[in-house]
């Protein structure tokens, strides 16, 4: 083993010679992430958080340490930078051996260290680079000097696929630009995008006077505001590292950028929610549990990729309607999502299993590319086979508790409920949301008893879960449904109002507009 200052001479054919030791027939590809960051002795952030996140998301993670910190829940007491020569040795060691899908950077506390990283990334290209410009922690601790701002702007940001600054870091990168509102976050994201990264995510978790946690995502053309309720907890140490590492892990698994960002935000939200009452350390900012998804309590780990606001415009497909209008399920799905559908349920009553599976795989590709969840109606086997985001089951289908045991804690499970008793049972069994109805008469389901607006409100009041209304809902009555004064009513599910129409895109836009207007009127 070399000393810290020693540099090993690596043979040019190092990777190719070792790769020949494994036959192609025996290879099973494992998603791989490299994190280049500082060590946190308290283990809530930095390298330690990165390793835990990747393990929790099912991704292999290697590490290169740039600095060693002395810190705990009370703050950062000291920072020791490792010699750039030794950091280069670490980088060469892992980059010459592993085939990383994504490199994620955290604390890069000197220009020399950034230079070393840039040189090694030039020598060993990777598919994606996630840059978390760790300069100011959420708690306000300064972790990097101002001298590296120029090299970040001029050299690192232009090669990044995504950067994930908090508002303080975004302000520093923009020469002190003031960021105190969502509008200013949007302006900052646009200005940062002009520096070269393909995507920008400005994190607003510490935005002053905001009841929500709001992150602004910008792809160069469109803005996405990713909102979630602010969670009251002291255990927020390492949220930025966790978010960036989760994005890297999802990218390594093949997700689109928007989908990776959405999954990462929900992962952090649910980790914070699960950990809000734990006590580790005596300081003001504690760590949280990255492995909440492994806990046995079905209530403790639900919704790891589920945001109740995704129920807003819930599109349920119908193959017969698509055939009637001479369009494929893929075309129908694209139009619905582009028009504003926020979640998709694939319902197929006619196709054989193999045909249904191929259809589901095609739909998964469309949904993931747009960051929209896909649920399978009834068929647990299809959901497992295509790795859908979840399922929706009825009262006569497989019991929810058994579905949860088969799918695990990460998948979304919805269940149809007509009564308060059914709604209560859905919560106990581990469902994530309730589909309640039919609210009005409908032709899409035979002999379906309607419950009306009063019945819908009763279910909402009895439920601890978010609710989506379904049954006979369209542009003419969607507003009245959303105005029944039930805070946990998150949206409407539609079938014929979308898919039994000449233009799915136009109808989706109209429905989305109607729902937004009704929500503002509440």
Curated annotation (Swiss-Prot):
Per UniProt, which keywords does this protein have? ATP-binding, Chloroplast, Kinase, Magnesium, Metal-binding, Multifunctional enzyme, Nucleotide-binding, Plastid, Thiamine biosynthesis, Transferase, Transit peptide
Q: Where in the cell is it found?
A: Plastid, Chloroplast
Tell me which residues bind 2-[(2R,5Z)-2-carboxy-4-methylthiazol-5(2H)-ylidene]ethyl phosphate: 442-444, 472, 495-496
Q: Quote the catalytic activity from the record.
A: 2-[(2R,5Z)-2-carboxy-4-methylthiazol-5(2H)-ylidene]ethyl phosphate + 4-amino-2-methyl-5-(diphosphooxymethyl)pyrimidine + 2 H(+) = thiamine phosphate + CO2 + diphosphate; 2-(2-carboxy-4-methylthiazol-5-yl)ethyl phosphate + 4-amino-2-methyl-5-(diphosphooxymethyl)pyrimidine + 2 H(+) = thiamine phosphate + CO2 + diphosphate; 4-methyl-5-(2-phosphooxyethyl)-thiazole + 4-amino-2-methyl-5-(diphosphooxymethyl)pyrimidine + H(+) = thiamine phosphate + diphosphate; 4-amino-5-hydroxymethyl-2-methylpyrimidine + ATP = 4-amino-2-methyl-5-(phosphooxymethyl)pyrimidine + ADP + H(+)
The organism's place on the tree of life at top rank: Eukaryota
Provide the GO biological process annotations: thiamine biosynthetic process; thiamine diphosphate biosynthetic process
Where it mainly occurs, coarsely classed, is: plastid
Q: Which Pfam families match?
A: Phos_pyr_kin, TMP-TENI
Binding-site list for 4-amino-2-methyl-5-(diphosphooxymethyl)pyrimidine: 345-349, 377, 416, 445
Null mutant: what phenotype?
A: Seedling lethality. Mutant plants can grow on synthetic medium supplied with thiamine.
Q: Where is the signal peptide?
A: none
Question: What metabolic or biological pathway is this protein involved in?
Answer: Cofactor biosynthesis; thiamine diphosphate biosynthesis; thiamine phosphate from 4-amino-2-methyl-5-diphosphomethylpyrimidine and 4-methyl-5-(2-phosphoethyl)-thiazole: step 1/1; Cofactor biosynthesis; thiamine diphosphate biosynthesis; 4-amino-2-methyl-5-diphosphomethylpyrimidine from 5-amino-1-(5-phospho-D-ribosyl)imidazole: step 2/3
- The keyword Chloroplast is annotated on this UniProt entry: yes
Enzyme Commission (EC) number = 2.5.1.3, 2.7.1.49
Its cellular-component GO annotations read: chloroplast; chloroplast stroma
Q: Which residues does Mg(2+) bind?
A: 378, 397
Transit peptide per record: 1-36
Q: Name one GO molecular function term.
A: thiamine-phosphate diphosphorylase activity
Q: What does the record say about how the cofactor binds?
A: Binds 1 Mg(2+) ion per subunit.
Query: What cofactor is this protein dependent on?
Result: Mg(2+)
- What family does the entry list? Belongs to the thiamine-phosphate synthase family.
- Function recorded in the entry: Essential for thiamine biosynthesis. Bifunctional enzyme that catalyzes the phosphorylation of hydroxymethylpyrimidine phosphate (HMP-P) to HMP-PP and condenses 4-methyl-5-(beta-hydroxyethyl)thiazole monophosphate (THZ-P) and 2-methyl-4-amino-5-hydroxymethyl pyrimidine pyrophosphate (HMP-PP) to form thiamine monophosphate (TMP).
Task: Cite the HAMAP family for this sequence.
Answer: TMP_synthase (MF_00097)
Q: This protein is called what?
A: Thiamine biosynthetic bifunctional enzyme TH1, chloroplastic
This chain's source organism reads Arabidopsis thaliana (Mouse-ear cress)
């Amino acid at each position: 083993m070399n000393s810290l200052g020693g540099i090993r001479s690596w043979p040019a054919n190092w990777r190719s010679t070792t790769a020949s030791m494994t036959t192609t027939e025996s290879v099973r590809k494992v998603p791989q992430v490299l994190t280049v960051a500082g060590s946190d002795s308290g283990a809530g952030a930095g390298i330690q958080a990165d390793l835990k996140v990747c393990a929790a998301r099912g991704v292999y993670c290697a590490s290169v340490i740039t600095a060693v910190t002395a810190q705990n829940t009370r703050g950062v007491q000291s920072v020791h930078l490792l010699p750039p020569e030794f950091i280069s040795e670490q980088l060469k060691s892992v980059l010459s051996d592993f085939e990383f899908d994504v490199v994620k950077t955290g604390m890069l506390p000197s220009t020399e260290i950034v230079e070393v990283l840039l040189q090694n990334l030039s020598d060993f290209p990777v598919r994606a680079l996630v840059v978390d410009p760790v300069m100011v922690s959420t708690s306000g601790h300064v972790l990097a000097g101002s001298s590296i701002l120029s090299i970040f702007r001029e050299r690192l940001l232009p090669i990044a696929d995504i950067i994930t600054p908090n508002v303080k870091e975004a302000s520093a990168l923009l020469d002190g630009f003031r960021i105190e509102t969502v509008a200013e976050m949007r302006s900052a994201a646009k200005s940062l995008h002009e520096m070269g990264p393909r995507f920008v995510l400005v994190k607003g978790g510490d935005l002053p006077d905001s009841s929500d946690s709001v992150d602004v995502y910008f792809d160069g053309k469109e803005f996405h505001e990713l909102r979630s309720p602010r969670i009251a907890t002291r255990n927020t140490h390492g949220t930025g590292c966790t978010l960036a590492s989760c994005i890297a892990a999802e990218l390594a698994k093949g997700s689109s950028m928007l989908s990776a960002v959405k999954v990462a935000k929900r992962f952090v939200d649910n980790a914070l929610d699960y950990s809000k009452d734990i006590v580790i350390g005596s300081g003001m900012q504690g760590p949280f549990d990255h492995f909440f998804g492994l806990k046995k309590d079905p209530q403790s780990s639900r919704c790891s990729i589920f945001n109740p606001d995704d129920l807003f415009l819930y599109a349920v497909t119908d193959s017969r309607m698509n055939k009637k209008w001479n369009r494929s399920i893929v075309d129908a799905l694209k139009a619905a999502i582009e028009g504003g559908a926020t979640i998709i349920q694939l319902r197929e009553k006619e196709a054989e299993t193999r045909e249904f599976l191929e259809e589901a795989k095609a739909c998964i590709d469309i949904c993931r590319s747009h960051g929209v969840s896909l649920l399978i109606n009834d068929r647990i086997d299809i959901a497992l086979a295509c790795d859908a985001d979840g399922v929706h089951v009825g009262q006569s289908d497989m019991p929810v508790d058994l579905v949860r045991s088969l799918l695990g804690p990460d998948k979304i499970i919805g269940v149809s409920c007509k009564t308060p008793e059914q709604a209560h049972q859905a919560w106990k069994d581990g469902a994530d949301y309730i589909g309640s109805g039919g609210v009005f008469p409908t032709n899409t389901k035979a002999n379906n008893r309607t419950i009306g607006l009063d019945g819908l409100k009763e279910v909402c009041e009895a439920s601890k879960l978010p609710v989506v209304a379904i049954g006979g809902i369209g542009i003419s009555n969607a507003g009245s449904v959303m105005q029944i004064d039930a805070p946990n009513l998150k949206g409407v599910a539609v079938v014929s109002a979308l898919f039994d129409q000449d233009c799915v895109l136009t109808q989706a836009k109209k429905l989305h507009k109607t729902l937004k207007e009704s929500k503002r009127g509440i």
